[in-house]
């Protein structure tokens, strides 16, 4: 692939998905896009670039290129700490604040193959009677149609269920299907999957009490990070929560959120109305059901 072709691809990916591809990642583009070129009967990435130049913005080949370059790695209860925050801080605070309306909305902004929202759903299931009469909605979005199809099916191979999933949860919430495992219908039914590009307007999704936006911002340039964070803030109430990845922060990007003291990766809207839940009032529930 020529430097000019690679520059074109970098610009296309940035415009359509926000993904910033550094110059040293040409090898990654070649390995992921050659199968796309072959699928369309093209003999080289140069031919793929020419096809992209001639295609309309919404042409399927452009969508396939973006999906091929999007990082889709995910696993159950990834990094553990965010799910500890969910258990020990976020849910107790939201259940106290929403005791009257008994409704909580959660958004996983880049759900990939579904392990993150399903991990949250399994965590909610373990609360049991404490959530009786509550409506807890989990909306999970991703830019890729392909990974969303896998997420909706909820079928994972042996390697995938061994990455982070406690054996107790595997036994309780999964059924073996051949050599794979399918998550139980009751868990799948707790998650709504939708296709969404975070660069596009997402105001129509409504307000969310909790937003998981992990390992997404690291692929964006600073301008896009600021834009996404500020728009997320407009989708959240004053007492909402934002969870970012371990390598991500709002510091130096926006004043719409502030870090929650002693809660790594957890942020709250920048308003005096938000206070940490006292430890004595924390509701405990075990993620390892």
Residue spans for each PLM region:
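Conserved AdoMet
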Residues: 1-107
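Conserved class I S-adenosyl-L-methionine
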Residues: 102-114, 119, 137-139
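Conserved beta-strand signature within the Rossmann-like core of class I S-adenosyl-L-methionine
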Residues: 238-246
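Conserved SAM-binding loop of SAM-dependent methyltransferases across substrates and taxa
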Residues: 113-131
